Regions:
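Conserved catalytic core of the tyrosine transesterase superfamily
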Residues: 1-232
Length: 232
């Protein structure tokens, strides 16, 4: 990229001086930033008719950046994630320009005001009631192993707890002797929350707790509520 225009000059300074020496950015990250600018330069040449040797900071505007971003999704069929990554690079460059090209502060701030695109195509996946029922019917509730699996599935569905939170449960985490039936969950940052349990889940847990396998292993209420397949 030639350095005979103010745009090329500042791009070179940004990539070769600011990012590696002031921000201590890795070489791989710098390469990804460079690729984003290469795409922008190619867009300006192909769609705006401005060759790289003629491209100036005055052409680096909010309107042109928006056209570039739309070009990525509409014509290049890039994902929303890729579009937002390119926007993040451009915003970072614009932030830096606020300090080295102060005279165009408003121009850079307009670019920085461009919002990231929400991925409207991303849908939340969830189980239907029929799916949950089918899932809970899979373990063989007549065996200790099946009772364990059923208790795990039912608890995770009922409480929405994370896998690690499930692994951290101890025998005394559950209160099944009197109402209200509850379970104490320790989450991130050792934050504790008390979650109520429906009677249907309580019945499943009671059967599991009474199983021969669990009684033999859980002599202490501080022992794990669920052992792994190796009995640990």
């Amino acid at each position: 990229m030639r350095t005979d225009t103010d745009f090329a000059k500042q791009i070179s300074r940004y990539l070769s001086e600011y990012l590696p020496h002031e921000r201590n950015v890795s070489s791989n990250t710098i390469l990804s930033y460079r690729d984003a600018f290469v795409q922008y330069v190619e867009f300006m040449r192909e769609k705006k008719g401005i060759k790289v040797e003629k491209l100036r900071l005055e052409n680096f505007t909010k309107d042109n950046v928006l056209c570039f971003l739309n070009h990525l999704t509409d014509e290049k069929h890039c994902s929303v994630k890729t579009r937002n990554q390119r926007l993040a690079v451009i915003k970072s460059f614009s932030t830096w320009l606020q300090y080295v090209e102060v005279g165009r502060m408003e121009q850079w701030q307009k670019i920085r005001s461009i919002p990231a695109m929400r991925d409207m195509e991303r849908k939340l996946n969830y189980l239907t009631l029929e799916g949950v029922k089918l899932l809970l019917e899979q373990p063989d509730a007549n065996t200790p192993k099946g009772q364990r699996h059923l208790a795990i599935l039912a608890l995770m569905y009922e409480t929405g707890m994370r896998v690690q939170e499930l692994a951290d449960l101890t025998v005394d985490s559950v209160r099944l002797d009197v109402e209200p039936y509850t379970i104490r969950i320790v989450g991130k940052g050792r934050k504790t929350r008390i979650v109520p349990l429906f009677k249907s889940i309580v019945d499943i847990l009671r059967i599991y707790l009474k199983s021969e396998q669990h009684v033999l292993k859980s002599a202490s209420i501080q022992h794990p509520l669920f052992y792994n397949t190796r009995g640990e």
